[in-house]
Amino acid sequence: MDTLLFATNNKNKAREVEEALKKINFPIHVITNQDLTDPPHVLETGTTFLANAKLKAHKMAEFSNLPTLADDSGLSVDKLNGAPGVHSARYGGEAHNDALNNAKLLAELGGVPREKRQATFHTTMVVSWPGRFDDDLVTQGEIRGEILTYPRGDGDFGYDPLFFVPDKGKTFAEMTVDEKNAISHRGQALRKLLAELPTWWKKMENE
């Protein structure tokens, strides 16, 4: 096989992976759910990032009969017992509404001092081969930081304006794309995936 399905509707994410694979001389065509006819909607009912990534990868690999990459990411705040966690995208009550999500996060942390606002951004990536779900390739990435009391930066995506990385002295939203990718949870998980995918892929094809 020379096609990888990325279980997402985000073409930019698929393009990012395809370009990265070309750079390591593993030129696989990456498509998304938008390239399929009537793809199923997968409910993310898992209680962990790994469970949700596996749900999406398995369902879409089964539907498409293609090797499938799925990911799940989120923010876990220590003071909130790990919330928003797997509910990060819809924490404010409406899916992918960054303003509502950030407003709720700030409200939940109202009055909490800076030294108690630690948090972790997490990404899990899973690649599944059709009919071989016991052989999933799994990579993960994490980065620690803290939640500010007000947003900073122009990169207005998700919780990035509130997530401050002390070692860099910046929020994710204040970093360039390259700066963020070099240290981010997603960047870590993707680099691990790229390191392992060619060998795993060939093994799946030959068994």
Curated annotation (Swiss-Prot):
An example Gene Ontology CC term for this record: cytosol
Any GO BP annotation: purine nucleoside triphosphate catabolic process
Cofactor(s) the protein requires to work: Mg(2+)
The organism's place on the tree of life at top rank: Bacteria
Catalytic activity: XTP + H2O = XMP + diphosphate + H(+); dITP + H2O = dIMP + diphosphate + H(+); ITP + H2O = IMP + diphosphate + H(+)
InterPro entries: dITP/XTP_pyrophosphatase, ITPase-like_fam, RdgB/HAM1
Keywords: Hydrolase, Magnesium, Metal-binding, Nucleotide metabolism, Nucleotide-binding
Residues annotated as catalytic: 72
Cofactor binding: number and manner: Binds 1 Mg(2+) ion per subunit.
Pfam families referenced in this protein's UniProt entry, alphabetically: Ham1p_like
E.C. number(s) listed in UniProt: 3.6.1.66
Gene Ontology molecular function terms on file: dITP diphosphatase activity; ITP diphosphatase activity; metal ion binding; nucleotide binding; ribonucleoside triphosphate phosphatase activity; XTP diphosphatase activity
Keyword presence, Metal-binding: yes
Binding-site list for substrate: 8-13, 73, 157-160, 180, 185-186
Binding-site positions, Mg(2+): 72
Enzyme class: hydrolase
NCBIfam families reported for this sequence: PRK14822.1, RdgB/HAM1 family non-canonical purine NTP pyrophosphatase
Quaternary state and interactors: Homodimer.
Family membership: Belongs to the HAM1 NTPase family.
Name of this protein: dITP/XTP pyrophosphatase
Species per Swiss-Prot/TrEMBL record: Lactobacillus johnsonii (strain CNCM I-12250 / La1 / NCC 533)
Lineage start: Bacteria, Bacillati, Bacillota, Bacilli, Lactobacillales
